[in-house]
């Protein structure tokens, strides 16, 4: 998502060398738990940092899949994919400085919710993408102790897509709010679409024209960039094709969005193909608009020291985080750096508000790692610390 401006680059070393700078993170996993982690940065360049579990909640069980923080209202939303049931759920929690999550509400959804986003002028709506249920639902969340269904839209396809095993039906994979708060975008992996909904009032959505993606590409997640010159770009990461595609976005008078493709390239850089079996996952753009980072799963591009047992010499395979520089004039991307994600299957990652820390959720290793990042250069530095989390990690976010 678009974030506040970075702190000046000169402030970053001060943060990393502070005696005990503490930050809270939340991690969800298929164990059924949402775990609060305490990150303490200490030592020169944070080389003696620690990441420890503070508390845990099973209120989003059995299969937590996504975390959405509403920091302004001290609320955390969690979707439960319902892997062992026929329905999904969404839960809300009150957050606190001690890291303890107090459950406020929980309600059923259509099956397999995998993403949620708060929308509406006062944050009174919550949209949810339901991958297995081929649908999008939205809720009235104006009452913190209630999650009231407003409406659902279920999608259909007349025939499977070019990749029948993955595109047997529509599979909405994310809900994402545009920079103006006027639209919710829904990448649909199964239908090769980015569905678009206009925000209508405090907690309602209205379907408008969709973006048609390349056949068989499998849209997964999106990010927006607004340039200093006022251009708006949409960046789409596609799981099946392992590509990032840039669209010039136009806000039309009829309250729809127009999309013009201006760039498309591999998640591994110009002229590079994804390794067999690799699949693109997360995408993020720095708030200064200069850098874009993606995670790639199942490429085993690196062999690294086990972050859980530093100094013992054990080596483990690691998938990739690939960073690109952004050409704000054209929307194009140029590969800047390939970096180990800290283990296997980096399903999701988050970046701190200051842009100096990256938290990665490694699904297959049941691990969260924290990596240093130079906000000025855009490059990742080193794995600072890690923590084991019960179950397959599905999301990790900073409490900020």
Model region roles, listed by residue range:
Residues 56-60, 106-110, 164-169, 210-215, ...:
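Surface loop/turn motifs at the tips and blade-to-blade linkers of beta-strand repeat domains
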Residues 36-47, 92-100, 138-148, 197-204, ...:
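Short loop/turn segments immediately following beta-strands, especially the blade-tip
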Residues 1-23:
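Fungal secretory targeting signals
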Residues 68, 117-118, 176, 223, ...:
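Conserved beta-strand position repeated across blades of beta-propeller domains
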Residues 27, 78-79, 128, 186, ...:
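Residue position within the beta-strands of beta-propeller blades
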Residues 277-363:
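Loop/turn-rich, solvent-exposed surfaces of beta-rich toroidal or solenoidal domains
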Residues 22-23, 72-74, 121-124, 180-182, ...:
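Short coil/turn segments that connect the beta-strands within blades of beta-propeller domains
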Residues 100-174:
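Asp-box/WD-like beta-propeller blade repeats and closely related beta-sheet repeat scaffolds
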């Amino acid at each position: 998502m678009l974030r506040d401006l970075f702190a000046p680059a000169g402030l970053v070393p001060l943060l990393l060398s502070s005696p005990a700078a503490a930050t809270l993170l939340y991690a969800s996993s298929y164990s059924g738990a949402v775990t609060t982690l305490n990150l303490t940065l200490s030592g020169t360049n944070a080389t003696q940092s620690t990441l420890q579990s503070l508390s845990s909640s099973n209120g989003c069980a059995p299969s937590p899949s996504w975390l959405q923080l509403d920091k302004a209202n001290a609320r955390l939303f969690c979707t439960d994919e319902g892997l062992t049931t026929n329905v999904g759920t969404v839960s809300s929690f009150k957050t606190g400085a001690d890291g303890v999550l107090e459950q406020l509400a929980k309600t059923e959804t259509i099956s397999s919710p995998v993403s949620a986003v708060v929308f509406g002028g006062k944050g009174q709506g919550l949209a949810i993408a339901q991958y297995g249920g081929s649908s999008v639902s939205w809720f009235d969340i104006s009452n913190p102790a209630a999650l009231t269904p407003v409406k659902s839209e279920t999608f259909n396809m007349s025939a499977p897509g070019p990749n029948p095993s993955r595109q047997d039906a529509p599979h909405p994979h994310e809900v994402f709010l545009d920079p103006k708060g006027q639209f919710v975008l829904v990448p649909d992996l199964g239908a090769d679409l980015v569905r678009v909904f206009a925000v209508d009032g405090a907690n309602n959505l209205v379907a408008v024209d969709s973006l048609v993606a390349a056949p068989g590409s499998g849209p997964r997640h999106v990010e927006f960039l607004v340039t200093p010159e006022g251009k708006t770009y949409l960046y789409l990461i596609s799981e099946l094709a392992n590509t990032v595609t840039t669209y010039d976005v136009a806000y039309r008078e009829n309250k729809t969005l127009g999309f013009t493709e201006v760039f498309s390239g591999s998640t591994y850089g110009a002229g590079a193909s994804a390794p067999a079996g690799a699949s693109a996952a997360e995408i993020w753009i720095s708030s200064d608009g200069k850098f874009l980072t993606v995670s790639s799963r199942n490429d085993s591009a690196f062999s690294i020291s086990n972050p859980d047992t530093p100094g013992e010499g054990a080596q483990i395979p690691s998938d990739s985080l690939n960073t690109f520089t952004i050409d704000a004039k054209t929307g194009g991307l140029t590969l800047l750096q390939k970096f180990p994600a800290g283990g296997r299957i980096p399903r999701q990652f988050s970046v701190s508000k200051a842009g100096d820390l990256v938290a990665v959720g490694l699904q297959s290793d049941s691990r969260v790692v924290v990596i240093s990042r130079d906000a000025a250069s855009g490059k990742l530095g080193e794995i600072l610390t890690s923590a084991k989390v019960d179950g397959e990690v599905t999301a990790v976010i900073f409490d900020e």
